[in-house]
C-alpha cells in the first residue's frame, strides 16, 4: 500500500500526529567528477574561481537545501533540523579528471526521518559545484547519489561504504627502494594491492606524501596525501579516517608480500562493526597487525586522541581499544618483507 495515496487513490501527506518523537539521523553521499582543467584552480581541498570558493559555497547551499526540503519535495513534512554536517573531499582519479566526494549528515529529534533532507542537501551541494565550475568546462558528471545511513524510525539503514587504503612508506634503506615499487607478483606491489582491494572496495587510494608517486608506475592511481607532518603509517591511517569519516576502511601495507584474496575475504567476513578494528593477530606476540586491518568509523576518535598525546604507533593505539583479532591460516601470511634476505625467500 502506498501511504501517500488515500482510499480514493488521491495523493496526500501522511499524518504523523500519532507518532512519537525520537532521535533520527540520515547520511547521503554523491560524487562530482570534474575535468582536468579544474586542477589549475585547485588549492588543497578548495577550488578558487571568480565566483568564489567552490567547496565553501557548496556547503552553504547544501545546508540551505536541507532546511528547505519540505518546500521542494511535495509530501515531506516541515521539521526541525538539529544538526547538519558536510564532509567534502577532492581526490585525483587518474590523470584526466578528479572527483569530489560529498557526504551530508542530518540529525533531528522528531516524528519522521531526515533521509530526504540528507539527499536534498548533498544533491544541491553537487549542483552548486556544477554551477560554479561550468564556466571552465561542461564536462562535469554528478553520480552515485544514494542514502548510506538512516537510524531511528521503523527501520534502520546501514550501508556503510567500504574503502581501501594501500599504506605505503618512503624508501626502505635495507631494500634500496620504496616497498610499493618492489615487484613480487609481476608488477609493483602498490599496484597489486590496489587491484586486490578494488575487488571489494568502492574506492581505493594510495597513501602518499606530496608528489611522492610522480614519475613512477603508480602516478596515475588515486592518492590521499598525508595531512600535516608525516609520522609513519599513523599519518596515512589518520588521513584516511579524517578524509572519509563515515566509511569502513580496509587498510593493507606494502610490507605484506603474501597478501591475497583469501586473506582479505576472511578479514571482511569476520569484521566487527561495533569495534574500532578487526586485524590479524601476530602469531608470536599476539598483538594486532595494525597494517592489515578492517577499520570502522569508530577508529577516528581513537587515532585523533592518540595524535593529541603524541602516540604514533598504530599497534599501541589499537591496544588501547577493543579489537577483533583473527588468526592467519599460515604463519607467513602476514610476514613483513624488510630485507633482501626476506625478498630472496619469496623468489
From Swiss-Prot:
Molecular functions (GO terms): cyclic pyranopterin monophosphate synthase activity; GTP binding; metal ion binding; molybdenum cofactor guanylyltransferase activity; nucleotidyltransferase activity
Cofactor entry: Mg(2+)
SUPFAM superfamilies noted in UniProt: Molybdenum cofactor biosynthesis protein C, MoaC, Nucleotide-diphospho-sugar transferases
Family statement drawn from the similarity comment of this UniProt entry: In the N-terminal section; belongs to the MoaC family.
Disulfide bridge positions per record: none
Organism: Synechocystis sp. (strain ATCC 27184 / PCC 6803 / Kazusa)
Gene Ontology biological process terms from the UniProt entry: Mo-molybdopterin cofactor biosynthetic process
Name by which UniProt lists this protein: Molybdenum cofactor biosynthesis bifunctional protein
Function recorded in the entry: Catalyzes the conversion of (8S)-3',8-cyclo-7,8-dihydroguanosine 5'-triphosphate to cyclic pyranopterin monophosphate (cPMP).
Gene: moaC/mobA
Protein EC: 4.6.1.17, 2.7.7.77
NCBIfam families: moaC, PRK09364.1, PRK14500.1
Residue ranges of the region described as Molybdenum cofactor guanylyltransferase: 159-347
Source organism, top-level taxon: Bacteria
Region (Molybdenum cofactor biosynthesis protein C): 1-158
Keyword DNA damage: no
InterPro entries the UniProt entry points to: MoaC, MoaC_bact/euk, MoaC_sf, MobA-like_NTP_Trfase, Molybde_CF_guanTrfase, Mopterin_CF_biosynth-C_dom, Nucleotide-diphossugar_trans
Keywords, comma-separated and alphabetical: Cytoplasm, GTP-binding, Lyase, Magnesium, Metal-binding, Molybdenum cofactor biosynthesis, Nucleotide-binding, Transferase
Active site per database record: 131 (for moac activity)
Pfam family, one: NTP_transf_3
Binding site for substrate: 75-77, 116-117
Protein localization: Cytoplasm
The keyword Nucleotide-binding belongs to this UniProt entry's keyword annotation: yes
GO cellular component: cytoplasm
Domain comment, as recorded: The N-terminal domain of the MobA region determines nucleotide recognition and specific binding, while its C-terminal domain determines the specific binding to the target protein.
Binding site for GTP: 167-169, 179, 226, 255
Amino acid at each position: 500500500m502506498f501511504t501517500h495515496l488515500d482510499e480514493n487513490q488521491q495523493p496526500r501527506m501522511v499524518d504523523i500526529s500519532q507518532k512519537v518523537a525520537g532521535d533520527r539521523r540520515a547520511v547521503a553521499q554523491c560524487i562530482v567528477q570534474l575535468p582536468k582543467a579544474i586542477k589549475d584552480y585547485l588549492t588543497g581541498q578548495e577550488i578558487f574561481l571568480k565566483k568564489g570558493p567552490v567547496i565553501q559555497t557548496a556547503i552553504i547551499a547544501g545546508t540551505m537545501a536541507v532546511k528547505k526540503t519540505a518546500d521542494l519535495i511535495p509530501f515531506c513534512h516541515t521539521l526541525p533540523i538539529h544538526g547538519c554536517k558536510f564532509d567534502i573531499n577532492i581526490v585525483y582519479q587518474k590523470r584526466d579528471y578528479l572527483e569530489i566526494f560529498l557526504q551530508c549528515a542530518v540529525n533531528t529529534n522528531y516524528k519522521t526521518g531526515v533521509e530526504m533532507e540528507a539527499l536534498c542537501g548533498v544533491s544541491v551541494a553537487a549542483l552548486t559545484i556544477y554551477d560554479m565550475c561550468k564556466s571552465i568546462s561542461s564536462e562535469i558528471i554528478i553520480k552515485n547519489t544514494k542514502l548510506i545511513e538512516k537510524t531511528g524510525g521503523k527501520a534502520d539503514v546501514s550501508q556503510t561504504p567500504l574503502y581501501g587504503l594501500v599504506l605505503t612508506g618512503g624508501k626502505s634503506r635495507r631494500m634500496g627502494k620504496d616497498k610499493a615499487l618492489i615487484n613480487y607478483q609481476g608488477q609493483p606491489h602498490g599496484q597489486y594491492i590496489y587491484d586486490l582491494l578494488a575487488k571489494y572496495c568502492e574506492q581505493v587510494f594510495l597513501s602518499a606524501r606530496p608528489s611522492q608517486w610522480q614519475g613512477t608506475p603508480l602516478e596515475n592511481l588515486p592518492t590521499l596525501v598525508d595531512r600535516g607532518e608525516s609520522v609513519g603509517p599513523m599519518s596515512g591511517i589518520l588521513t584516511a579516517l579524517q578524509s572519509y569519516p563515515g566509511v569502513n576502511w580496509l587498510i593493507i601495507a606494502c610490507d605484506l608480500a603474501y597478501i591475497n584474496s583469501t586473506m582479505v575475504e576472511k578479514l571482511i567476513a569476520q569484521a566487527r562493526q561495533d569495534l574500532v578494528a578487526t586485524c590479524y593477530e601476530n602469531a608470536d606476540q599476539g598483538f594486532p597487525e595494525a597494517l592489515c586491518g578492517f577499520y570502522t568509523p569508530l577508529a577516528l576518535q581513537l587515532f585523533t586522541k592518540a595524535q593529541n598525546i603524541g602516540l604514533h604507533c598504530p599497534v599501541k593505539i589499537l591496544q588501547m581499544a577493543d579489537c577483533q583479532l583473527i588468526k592467519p591460516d599460515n604463519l607467513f601470511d602476514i610476514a613483513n618483507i624488510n630485507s633482501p634476505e626476506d625478498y630472496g625467500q619469496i623468489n
